[in-house]
Amino acid sequence: MIVHSIMEHLILYTSPYPKTRIGRPHDGGYVTVTLPGTYDALLSGGIANDISFEEHFLQLHPIPCYAFDGTIAHLPHANPTITFVKKNLGDSNTDNTTNLHEYMEPYHDIFMKMDIEGHEFRVMPTLQHGLMKKIKQLVIEIHSPGDIRMFPEYFKGLSDIDNRKMFDMLQGINQTHTLVHFHANNGCKIQEIDGIRLPHVFELTYLRNDFVLEKRKNTESLPTSLDRRNIPQNEDYVLSGFPYSTA
């Protein structure tokens, strides 16, 4: 008997290329995949007080970089290789927000990093019409409705985001990209969806589908040896079984 679950949109696959960690050891660093070829731009949404990821990435790939954050006046420290845009990411272009379309248009092999406190549910659905295929690799932190409901004052303007909208967004990403890394943020709680444990906040790494010619489900339990605790003093969440691994 085949049991279908909305969690199938988070099925994790084995990366066909080696992984590495970029950025600082704990929160703010991410596991990425070392892909063949080059990138032509780094677009980074959500900066706050940390550009360790951007600086490390640009040492490896000296390309144009745009960093977006409307909640800060300037970068944590000056870096001439990073163009700072004082705007938040959203579903439209205003004086205070951008949907990234104009920044993506000139490029074809983008590395995108996004940690924008729930507003991923606004901007990502606007990228479907051809723009998603410009993203060679995507690292994104998902702030699930479970977390949004717990902290409504923090996640202002996002009360309409429910599990259906979250999984619709993930299903949309899966049309053009393959999920190859999952890490639970241990600074939050955990919930159950269809009887399956899902952290309130989690980090995902996707590869564009032309780099995944054969999809093989992940066989490792999580976290992996490359992962680091977001909050060093908290234990990491251990995840295995569907949809995380065959283990």
Locate predicted features:
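Rossmann-like AdoMet/SAM-dependent catalytic core
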Residues: 1-41, 50, 56, 85-86, ...
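Switch II (G3) loop of P-loop NTPases
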Residues: 114-119
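Short, polar loop motifs at secondary-structure junctions
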Residues: 49, 67-75
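A general structural motif
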Residues: 38-39, 62, 107-111, 133-135
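Active-site regions of enzymes building and remodeling cell-envelope glycoconjugates
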Residues: 63-64, 79-88
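Conserved beta-strand signature within the Rossmann-like core of class I S-adenosyl-L-methionine
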Residues: 112, 134-145, 149
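Short loop/helix-cap segments at secondary-structure boundaries that form the rim of catalytic
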Residues: 57-58, 73-82, 130-133
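Class I SAM-dependent methyltransferase core
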Residues: 44
